Amino acid sequence: MAEPLKEEDGEDGSGEPPGRVKAEPVHTAASVVAKNLALLKARSFDVTFDVGDEYEIIETIGNGAYGVVSSARRRLTGQQVAIKKIPNAFDVVTNAKRTLRELKILKHFKHDNIIAIKDILRPTVPYGEFRSVYVVLDLMESDLHQIIHSSQPLTLEHVRYFLYQLLRGLKYMHSAQVIHRDLKPSNLLVNENCELKIGDFGMARGLCTSPAEHQYFMTEYVATRWYRAPELMLSLHEYTQAIDLWSVGCIFGEMLARRQLFPGKNYVHQLQLIMMVLGTPSPAVIQAVGAERVRAYIQSLPPRQPVPWETVYPGADRQALSLLGRMLRFEPSARISAAAALRHPFLAKYHDPDDEPDCAPPFDFAFDREALTRERIKEAIVAEIEDFHARREGIRQQIRFQPSLQPVASEPVCPDVEMPSPWAPSGDCAMESPPPALPPCSGPAPDTVDLTLQPAPPASELAPPKREGAISDNTKAALKAALLKSLRSRLRDGPSAPLEAPEPRKPVTAQERQREREEKRRRRQERAKEREKRRQERERKERGAGTLGGPSTDPLAGLVLSDNDRSLLERWTRMARPPVPAPAPAPAPTPKPSSAQPTSPPNGPVSQSTAPLQPAGSIPGPASQPVCPPPGPVPQPAGPVPAPLQTAPSTSLLASQSLVPPSGLPGSGAPEVLPYFPSGPPPPDPGLTPQPSTSESPDVNLVTQQLSKSQVEDPLPPVFSGTPKGSGAGYGVGFDLEEFLNQSFDMGVADGPQDGQADSASLSASLLADWLEGHGMNPADIESLQREIQMDSPMLLSDLPDLQEP
């Protein structure tokens, strides 16, 4: 055999010395790697869609490790959908089980903020050749990752609305005892109407009710590292819905700053970033760490104090940071739940308990705990497909009109149709004036007896006497005949009109459902405001009758305001009046001691108990001069401003309503309040000409109407003019396989994520990237640590039978 080898070398003409033959295995290994890479790409990037004549494929949205998703159009209705193809779905047990799990969960869920299955294509090939699964889903133009990391405007209202929809869907999911485990922006699908749907349930699990289920929970765990909860990284063995709330907090922070909150390069770096913000975990958390080396590593670090969220996100909304702080806690039990987060003041604008449903019954994960073979999983998936179509056909039969009137056109209507007409002379005469009773005798058979000659029954067998005014038998017969005649005429004129099947109902889009919910919420708020308005009117009438003895002169009458806004407006009205100096330090001329009611000049002190009785604009000029200074310029008070005139609380309200420019926010003195008027001039000097007092009342009413209007309106955030194209990750196709395979086979993983690749390699759904990025560590140690914290990779290349060992 040595001869042919030498001849082969001679034919090659390389002329290399025999010592260079050692490089041949390297060349062979590289060829095997290239072959395996080409094979994996061919198996995963199979974009040939065999969907029959019902759907028309438009374009490919994205592809990944688990499948390919394309947009399509249904030929019958023109509706656009997304079709996800899972090629070779039964080759790997892990991927087959993932497909079965996702089908079962999505069939169980029916929620506006969760991706829904519209159809599952039946296999068109024999059972033995069935390999690819086609699932028809809602079509969403983009995902939240593309929105955040693009030039698309993202306001605080967008963030609030996205977060509300995410928590609304999460509340429904958690009520079914389902934990998503892989929430990230690319798994949240978004359309141009700012509607959000949660997708990719392939890694979902149920709640762990016993320690024996912890291993099941961590099986095939693939949470993206940047959104991974601490209990999963530290192996705290406390796996609850709080895992998803941590991911929601990371997504929330990413929306606020449009950058990732904890972009760790590897496992250790991820822990460091979390502790830099949240500080060192409590001793209880450290003692609960399941991995000994991880516990020793955390204890070796110097203690750190938590950083205030105002420092992490300077200038962000305080209520938003309050909610963010309640989501991101080391202790899972200390995190806020989805239901409680919906009640947070930051989401009060959209919160509606009647429109935030729960899921019943809970989802059953019993099938997922069984050790299933590929053949059993295939049988289960085929059974799920048939069950989906059986349910849909059953629903169609329930809503379809039954053809109960169809036989009427060809068959006799009923025996009553042959009754004689009510206008027949013989029948009516016999019934109204029956002949005298005849003696019983043998006559013809009962079926041949003439009704007109039959004797009347005895009096004892007659029906009870009819009440006066009741409908007679003749009238009943006439009505019956008229109805039957009308029915026959309708059948004769248009026999197919009542039998036509109703035209198919136009499918209701998600946007129409959202409009219905907003209209329902608006009507509910209007009814609540009307009730509050009537209650306030009753209170004003009672207060006016008890104090003034006449009709109320409240300028806020008829307007709907909350108690807080009303109190602030009343304080503002008092501040709009000329300030009253304190009696003690007033340098005004001394009043006459002999007067029972001393008068004072315009700048003199006024009793504080008399000031709030009437607004400044309603006091007559001559009569009110001894009590209140004249309207117009506001004099500078000689003493300190009384406590009720402090303007700090009202400043925040007025600024938040955008009624005044920011430049009108100086100190808290009473003369500084005048710039807050929407149309008023700057505060005049005491020596200038007085302004008429009637100009103050319209300003207060205008502000009141604006505040009242803001209590009723519930505007949605502006729609997106153009959404960036999504990657398809939210449909559960997995991470970008081409880039991942190139990096994995070349062993050329960079130290960190490259620019423009924020959601690909570093956001892959496998811990294999963590192992490859662990520079400076022995691979055996990394694998040992991975086993210790019970986190396995779902993508085992050895499961593929076609791959060759290099």
UniProtKB/Swiss-Prot annotation:
Region (Required for binding to MAP2K5) residue spans: 78-139
Keyword list (alphabetical) reads: Acetylation, ATP-binding, Cell cycle, Cytoplasm, Differentiation, Kinase, Nucleotide-binding, Nucleus, Phosphoprotein, Serine/threonine-protein kinase, Transferase
What InterPro entries would the database entry show?
A: Kinase-like_dom_sf (IPR011009), MAP_kinase (IPR050117), MAP_kinase_CS (IPR003527), Prot_kinase_dom (IPR000719), Protein_kinase_ATP_BS (IPR017441), Ser/Thr_kinase_AS (IPR008271)
Positions with a binding annotation for ATP: I61, G62, N63, G64, A65, Y66, G67, V68, V69, K84
Q: Where is the composition biased (Polar residues)?
A: 647-660, 693-710
Instruction: Name the residue ranges of motif: Nuclear localization signal.
Output: 505-539
Entry function: Plays a role in various cellular processes such as proliferation, differentiation and cell survival. The upstream activator of MAPK7 is the MAPK kinase MAP2K5. Upon activation, it translocates to the nucleus and phosphorylates various downstream targets including MEF2C. EGF activates MAPK7 through a Ras-independent and MAP2K5-dependent pathway. As part of the MAPK/ERK signaling pathway, acts as a negative regulator of apoptosis in cardiomyocytes via interaction with STUB1/CHIP and promotion of STUB1-mediated ubiquitination and degradation of ICER-type isoforms of CREM.
Q: What is the name listed in the Swiss-Prot or TrEMBL entry for this protein? A: Mitogen-activated protein kinase 7
Task: Give the source species.
Answer: Rattus norvegicus
